[in-house]
Curated annotation (Swiss-Prot):
Biased composition (Low complexity): 196-209, 383-401, 679-690
Protein name per the record: Protein sip5
Subcellular localization(s) per the UniProt record: Cytoplasm
Basic and acidic residues bias (residue ranges): 27-37, 53-76, 174-183, 314-323, 551-580, 726-736
Family: Belongs to the SIP5 family.
């Protein structure tokens, strides 16, 4: 395809390349021939089983490559575990320090994350107790062979039986020859070449004394050079070799040496000597020799197995607002302002007994020395035998000092005799730095994601800027600004600041002014400090944006709650108005409504009493209309003095509309009968309820009032029809007075709700006719009066 080589041309090209480079690579021809044979394998041989099957090999290779990361890690951990087991067995078999071991004894099965090289060095220097073998049980009455069996991990024999493997003979007395041989061995072990005075020791030890071997061989790279002979180097090369040799020379650590093997101490086996006064570790509850570590603060015993398990906690956010106290002493002051922003911390390990920080221990070695030791160095520190002793022993193989009495004061964590937990784990600072960097990367990535989402939501059209997330989660600009529209750059200051922080390269097609182009920062360099500064600025702007957003959300929430409260109050007011309207329509308090009858409303004349003692309604107050009698038309009524405004009653046809006339005369003023009003109100309320049950659909939808209006004309017609056959049996009182007075005007107006405040106008129908036509048989002994709750009820014109 295109310019690529085809399959037929590849072997020729590779053949030409191999011939062209034959002088430089003598193995190229062989590789080419092997590749040709592998590519040109005969299929017939593979069928016969002679040639190899490529498919099977490919499948095996793919299966081998399908190993997951967890499987690789598990296989690696298993390999390391097997190597540790072998190394532990070898060390316990060949190495020891004063009867103790340099490897753990399996008291704790967790991960050994302490620095084993440092622990080994401290134990060989007798500054830290070795890993003694712990005893599950101990008795002061045990004999020597029982102590030996317990120390070697063998079954404890009876006191009077000595197993063959525990038999021992007393050490032979030292003769003169043995003394001389021992002295020569000691001198041989203690003789150390002085490497600080001369640099020729390393070269003499690494090269042979034969001068011919010091010459370069013909096959060496020096001999292949054609510029000059190796014996005549230039001055620059000589100076360079001397300089590099000084800088590249590794300072060799202290050289380990094995002391003469002596299994006895003061004529006793070393195990019996160590464990005859065993003491218990207060943490693991195992019995060890009395030569244990002592805490620097409270002088409590602790074995090395427990000591190496105590460490700083894992990196975590600071608690209770404490300052970061995990920085080294020399750099703590400089890092204090930087650690006040809630970074991860690792508090120093505390003492398990007195909970004092900066946990450390001291060690007083036994009075003898066996096993491994370091060759003496005149420049090395003196070997202190106890923390409270100022004497030192430089070359004594058997110091006669014994552990001193218990300290009365605590030692400082910076004391040279104190071994702290940070000493055996020097990588805690790097671990903390890595955790902080990881947390910072995650925080920056999250901030970048939030910022990107904010910018995308703020600019839904997406025509001003295009952003994408980079490898580390930091936003990078993926392209130039689309189009030359400069108005798309306008936005909130926070949006512009965030865009400035996330876009460090100037736009190519932007139409901004030259000043804005000049104010943009230069392209981002590969400097970590610049990235950190940008991330800090971005995080600050994000915090400001979140604060503004939270304030806006709080304001909207308050407005929403205020609207909800207002709506609730309005709803409650509507409910109260509706309840008041219901109580006004069907007056539950008949006496109150009857006692407060306005003087402007008409009354229905009772058939059982005279109206001479009651006050007539004045014609000048309110707008009263006469209801039309169904039996007699309004124009034939002798009491109708003149025509007034026509009143349109809902439910009536236009041909049935009649004119209403005001009252022609008023009755003389007299004391009103309140008891009659009460009786009339109660009688009319029962009448209205009975009529509402018989005629539920009397009101039409054309009325402006929400309450139903009764068609009083139809009601009067029904009453009139019922009265016609029973007119002869009707009992009438005061007939003469009623005839002399003539037919009075009857005014009936429906009651309206007091909650309307007099704003609703309810149409009223004036009915004029004889008293006999208006009063049915059922109400012959009752007085009926229509009262309204509103004082300003007006008839619609």
């Amino acid at each position: 395809m295109g310019n690529s080589q085809t399959k037929e041309s590849r072997p020729a090209a590779s053949h030409r390349r191999s011939h062209g480079g034959a002088g430089r690579s003598p193995y190229s021809e062989r590789h080419h021939s092997e590749g040709s044979r592998s590519r040109g394998s005969r299929p017939d041989l593979s069928i016969l089983g002679i040639g190899g099957s490529h498919h099977e090999r490919d499948v095996a290779t793919l299966e081998h490559r399908r190993e997951t990361r967890q499987e690789r890690e598990a296989r690696k951990l298993e390999k390391e575990r097997i190597a540790r087991v072998k190394e532990r067995e070898r060390s316990m078999r060949e190495e020891h320090v004063d009867g103790g071991y340099l490897v753990t004894q399996g008291v704790y099965t967790g991960t050994e994350d302490f620095n084993k090289a440092i622990v080994r060095q401290l134990m060989i220097e007798r500054r830290l107790a070795p890993f003694w073998r712990g005893l599950n049980d101990f008795s002061e009455s045990w004999t020597e062979h029982q102590l030996m069996a317990a120390a070697r991990g063998l079954p404890i024999p009876p006191p009077d039986e000595i197993p063959p493997e525990l038999e021992y003979t007393n050490p032979p007395k030292a003769t003169d020859d043995s003394k001389e041989s021992a002295d020569s061995k000691m001198i041989q072990h203690l003789t150390v070449p002085i490497t600080s005075r001369s640099q020729s020791y390393g070269s003499d030890a690494s090269q042979s004394s034969n001068p011919t071997n010091s010459l370069p061989s013909p096959a060496s790279p020096i001999a292949s050079g054609t510029s000059s002979s190796p014996l005549f180097r230039t001055r620059a090369k000589t100076l360079a070799s001397l300089t590099t040799s000084k800088h590249n020379q590794v300072d060799p650590g202290p050289r380990e040496m094995q002391l003469p093997r002596d299994p006895f101490v003061n004529g006793q086996p070393i195990e019996a000597y160590l464990y005859k006064e065993a003491s218990e570790c207060p943490i693991c509850f195992l019995y060890y020799p009395p030569y244990l570590n002592r805490t620097r603060c409270c002088d409590q015993p602790i074995c090395s197995e427990c000591f190496v398990q105590i460490k700083r906690p894992d990196p975590h956010p600071p608690e209770h607002g404490d300052a970061d106290s995990n920085a080294p002493a020399e750099s703590q002051e400089g890092e204090r302002p930087e650690n006040q922003d809630g970074q991860l911390v690792m508090e120093p390990a505390a003492c398990p007994f007195c909970v004092q920080p900066e946990f450390g221990v001291t060690y007083a070695p036994p009075p003898f020395r066996r096993g491994l030791t370091y060759a003496l160095d005149p420049n090395s520190r003196p070997n202190f035998t106890s923390p409270v002793s100022s004497t030192s022993s430089l070359a004594s193989a058997n110091p006669a000092t014994v552990p001193g009495r218990r300290r009365a004061t605590s030692l400082s964590a910076s004391d040279p005799l104190v071994i702290t937990t940070d000493r055996i784990r020097p990588d805690w600072a790097q671990k903390l730095a890595n955790a902080r960097a990881h947390a910072a990367r995650r925080s920056a990535a999250a901030t970048a994601l939030h910022t990107a989402a904010y910018l995308m939501n703020s600019n839904p059209t997406g025509d001003s800027r295009n952003f994408s997330l980079g490898r580390r989660g930091v936003m990078r600009r993926s392209g130039a600004v689309e189009g030359g529209n400069s108005s798309s750059r306008t936005g909130s200051p926070a949006l512009q600041a965030l865009a400035f922080l996330t876009d460090r390269r100037p736009a190519g097609t932007d139409t901004d002014s030259a000043e804005e182009q000049g104010n943009l920062a230069p392209p981002r360099q590969s400097s970590r400090r610049n990235r950190i500064d940008d991330l800090e600025e971005m995080m600050m702007m994000e915090a400001i944006r979140l604060s503004l957003a939270s304030e806006e959300e709080r304001r909207k929430r308050e407005e929403k709650e205020a609207k909800k409260d207002a709506k609730k109050r309005e709803k409650e007011a509507k409910k109260a108005e509706k309840a008041a309207r219901k109580t006004g329509m069907y007056s539950n308090n008949a006496s109150g409504s009857a006692l407060d009858v306005p003087s402007g409303l008409g009354r229905v004349v009772s058939s059982s009493s005279s109206i001479t003692g009651e006050e007539a309604t004045p014609a000048g107050k309110g707008k009263e209309v006469d209801r039309v009698s169904p039996n007699a038309p309004a124009e034939n009524d002798p009491g109708a003095a003149g025509a007034s405004d026509a009143v349109q009653v809902p439910g009536l046809n236009s041909t049935e509309q009649h004119h209403s006339a005001p009252l022609s005369s008023a009755q003389p003023t007299s004391r009103p009968s309140h008891l009659r009003n009460v009786s009339s109100a109660s009688s009319f309320s029962s009448l209205v309820e009975s009529m509402s049950e018989d005629h539920p659909g009397a009101a039409e939808g054309t009325s402006s009032s929400p309450e139903p209006l009764y068609n009083f004309r139809s009601l009067a017609a029904v009453i009139g029809d019922d009265e016609k056959p029973e007119e002869a049996a009707e009992h009438v009182e005061d007939t003469l007075s009623q005839k002399a007075e003539g037919s009075g005007t009857q005014s009936v107006s429906p009651a309206t709700d007091s909650a309307l405040g007099g704003t609703a106008e309810i149409p009223c129908v004036t009915v004029e006719g004889d008293r006999d036509c208006l009063i049915p048989k059922e109400l012959e002994t009752r007085s009926v009066e229509l009262t309204g709750a509103t004082r300003n009820a007006e008839a619609t014109s």
